[in-house]
Regions:
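Alpha-helical lid/collar subdomain of P-loop NTPases
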Residues: 20-23, 27-84, 91-92, 232-235, ...
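Conserved alpha-helical scaffold flanking the Walker A/P-loop in AAA+ ATPase domains
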Residues: 95-96, 150-171, 220-228, 482-504, ...
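Conserved catalytic/switch belt of AAA+ P-loop NTPases
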Residues: 180-231, 241, 253, 480, ...
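A short helix-turn-beta junction within AAA+ P-loop NTPase domains corresponding to the substrate/partner-engaging
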Residues: 127, 189, 232, 248-267, ...
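AAA+/P-loop NTPase substrate/partner-engagement loops
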Residues: 124-151, 456-483
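Loop/turn-to-beta-strand initiation segments
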Residues: 102, 167-171, 231-237, 434, ...
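Walker A/P-loop
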Residues: 103-134, 435-465, 740
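Phosphate-binding P-loop
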Residues: 86, 94-101, 164-166, 427-433, ...
């Protein structure tokens, strides 16, 4: 055994200069064009390969293509028919670095552009992909090996980095700036020397060194030494944001030196204008030109210096079908879905955006369109998961086809006001193309509105409550154990909703940590996901393409760990308004801004609130109007303490108060307000201010006479205490008892 160890150490201590010279020799041979192939060329509309061996060429850079071992791991349907010139340059640069055996680091603005470019390159070169979305919860075991218990025995399972190294795949690491700084150094040696020690005792070594040892000692000795060959095709592509412009951890200098970096930028103005004109032929070209000019202005360094968030350029392309279907929308209507600047900018920032809008003659187009309503909703006869919707815009009726479920639901606890009708129609337009985020104050009716939307479209709703300490595993897969003690992965409600075509409601987007939320970006943008147990979720288009190319059934693909995201799946996030500026409560970052289309939901007016509460609770009398008058006085107060008290009197809370007043109409307004606001626990100053507001509105404390003759009586399964009665629950004889 000592001889084996001596031999391993001997070969591992070969002169570094010799190994480096051999490596550079191979790189120079590749650069000098040692490929002996016939002629080939690259076109922006198609790729032409030679008959002897498939080769792809971009300009003067060429790469021989290999048949993938697992074609289901190669990205599909990302390459457009006509590739823009700027994208061709980026692909050429990536091919150069790939040919040199170098790892790549793509920097750029928040959004899916860097990931899209990576998947285009992998599809072009027919490379298999291992994808890891990094977050603050990522650990060393998520990259190397994870220990699982099967049949009472611990086993080490290779994770993405190890699988990619052994199988010659491309490891894509997205979110480099989010991971803890002590995690990525475990990949240092793998990036630099293609070596890595594994927890199960194996050692990964470079292909050249492995082949040399194999030729000298044979496969049996290599297996005994537990040496594993890192494929020469193994590459790493890291995707990240430039820090410190964006929040996150900068790369350590040793790790940074392992990559060749490139800044990925959006297409130039002229090329983008051609794209959006082709996507929205029903919209005036001049209007599209002004919209694009405005969005490019918000991406300049001057705008960044003013504290303005980057405009989500990819969402502009995603949302253009809305404008094309309903050209009566104003430009401001269209822009506010992608860039709700009034939600997250202070007054100075709002003025800067409005001045920019005025520069491009956008704000002069008018305010948001008022007359917007849903005329009819009907099931599609061709597709059970499609819904035909007619929306009235002004005096015209426009037809849309949107995703929907197959359930038949009726909303009995929703009161529609003119404002709700307009907002529902506006949200439905965004639902036709993208996922949505509804932002509004606490208790204003966001959840009720979404439930009504789900009932209208026939969705089954899966609500996911978000919280501050929520991890990436809570969002995707949770680790649990079986009755026998084996470790298994349990799908999260969000993933189940994606597989079953449900409406996933992310309630409390403002609470969850921004780094944890980043793991679902690929699901939002691409409808694809890679889970911790190795399962891969693909969009409907990519899944059906694989079925056709590989001639496999749905069940056979699922047997390979490939599952389809249901085409009707949608996400609606609910959040409270962020604090303006860059404070602690500013949850709306450029990354989150690029994930959804946004809708601002205001609190109901006093008249609207009275209508809703009266119809839902049937509360008569003058108590409720007095209550609402006090509530709106608190909400509109200039005193921050009173406004914070007003949050306890949301529409949701007022509905509870209305139901209580229906059963106990003799209760005074003063008592109801104090109970709802928990006035007994308020600071003395806030309590005195609240009393002054109540007194100003003519509401005073009413002294009640305590009845000392209250009796407690139980008769016929009814409990009576004074004037209050409640039915008792009859305990069944078959219920188990826990006492002797």
């Amino acid at each position: 055994m000592l001889q084996y160890i001596f031999l391993v150490n001997y070969y591992f201590r070969l002169d570094a200069a010799i190994m480096s010279a051999l490596r550079h020799k191979n790189l120079i041979c590749k650069l000098l064009g040692s490929f002996n192939h016939s002629k080939f060329y690259f076109s922006t509309s198609k790729f032409v390969y030679t008959t002897k061996k498939e080769v792809i060429k971009i300009g003067g850079v060429s790469k021989a293509l290999k048949v993938p071992k697992n074609p289901e791991l190669v990205p599909k349907n990302y390459l457009p028919k006509n590739i823009p010139t700027e994208t061709i340059r980026d692909l050429k640069w990536m091919m150069q670095k790939d040919s040199l055996g170098q790892d790549i680091f793509l920097l750029g603005r928040p959004g899916p552009l860097r990931r899209l470019l990576t998947q285009q390159y992998l599809e072009l070169t027919k490379r298999e992909m291992e994808y890891v979305a990094l977050s603050r919860d990522t650990t060393e075991s998520d990259l190397k090996q994870r220990r699982e218990i099967l049949s009472g025995t611990a086993h080490y399972m290779d994770q993405a980095a190890v699988r990619a190294a052994l199988e010659g795949r491309v490891l894509v690491l997205e979110g480099i700036e989010k991971v803890e700084r002590n995690v990525l150094p475990v990949l240092n040696n793998l990036l630099e020397n293609r070596e890595m020690h594994l927890e199960d005792g194996r050692l990964l070594i470079p292909a050249a060194r492995y082949d040399s040892l194999l030729a000298e000692h044979g496969a049996e000795v290599m297996e005994k030494w537990r040496l594993m060959r890192v494929s020469e095709d193994f590459r790493v592509i890291a995707l990240g944001l430039p820090v410190p412009k964006y929040t996150g951890s900068p790369l350590d200098p040793p790790l940074r030196s392992r990559f060749q970096a490139r800044n990925i930028q959006h297409l130039p103005y002229a090329q983008q204008l051609d794209v959006i004109i082709s996507l929205a032929p029903n919209v005036d070209k001049e209007v599209l030109s002004r919209l694009l000019s405005f969005s490019h202005t918000l991406l300049t360094e001057e705008s960044s210096g003013l504290g303005l968030l980057d405009f989500p350029m990819e969402n502009l392309v995603t949302g253009l079908p809305i404008y094309n279907s309903v050209p009566e929308l104003t430009p401001l209507d269209f822009i506010s879905r992608f860039y709700p600047y009034k939600l997250f900018l202070p007054s100075d920032g709002q003025k800067s955006v409005e001045d920019t809008l005025q520069t491009f003659h956008i704000s002069s187009q008018g305010n948001k369109i008022k007359r917007l309503s849903i005329e009819s909703v009907s099931r599609s006869s061709e597709n059970p998961h499609s819904v035909e919707v007619e929306i009235k815009v002004g005096n015209k009726v426009r037809s849309l086809t949107v995703n929907g479920g197959t359930s038949v639901n009726t909303s009995k606890d929703f009161v529609t006001t003119p404002y709700h009708s307009w907002l529902m129609a506006d949200i439905l337009l965004s639902h036709s193309t993208s996922d949505i985020c509804v932002v509004g104050p606490r208790g204003c009716g966001k959840s009720a509105l979404v439930r009504n939307l789900g009932d209208l479209l026939g969705y089954k709703i899966e609500t996911i409550q978000l919280y501050q300490d929520m991890t990436a595993r809570d969002l995707l897969q949770q680790r649990t154990t079986t009755d026998t003690g084996d470790t298994v992965w349990r799908l999260s409600p969000l993933v189940n909703a994606a597989l079953n075509g449900q409406l996933a409601v992310l309630d409390g987007l403002h609470r969850v940590h921004k780094g944890s939320l980043a793991v679902i970006q690929r699901l939002v943008h691409d409808r694809e996901l890679q889970l911790y147990d190795g399962t891969r979720l693909l969009s409907e288009t990519s899944f059906k393409t694989l079925m056709q190319e590989l001639n496999l059934s749905k069940e056979e693909l699922e047997g390979r760990g490939i599952r389809m995201v249901h085409p009707a799946f949608r996400i609606i996030a609910l959040a409270e308004p962020p604090t303006t500026g860059t404070g602690k409560g500013q949850w709306l970052t450029p990354e989150i801004l690029s994930m959804f289309l946004y809708h601002d939901m205001r609190s109901l007016s006093q008249t609207e609130e009275l209508q809703v509460i009266t119809e839902m609770t049937g509360t008569p009398g003058s108590i409720l109007p007095e209550m609402l008058r006090v509530t709106h006085a608190l909400r509109n107060s200039e005193d921050a303490a009173l406004r914070s008290v007003a949050t306890s009197l949301s529409t949701r809370q007022l509905l509870r108060v209305g139901r209580r007043l229906q059963k106990f109409p003799e209760e005074s307004v003063y008592s109801v307000v104090n109970k709802a606001c928990l006035a007994r626990f308020l600071p003395a100053l806030a309590k005195d201010t609240l009393d002054k507001v109540l007194e100003k509105n003519g509401i005073k404390q009413v002294k009640t006479i305590e009845d000392k003759n209250i009796q407690c009586v139980i008769q016929d399964q009814v409990l009576t205490i004074g004037n209050f009665r409640i039915c008792l629950i009859k305990i069944s004889d078959c219920m188990p008892t826990f006492y002797a």
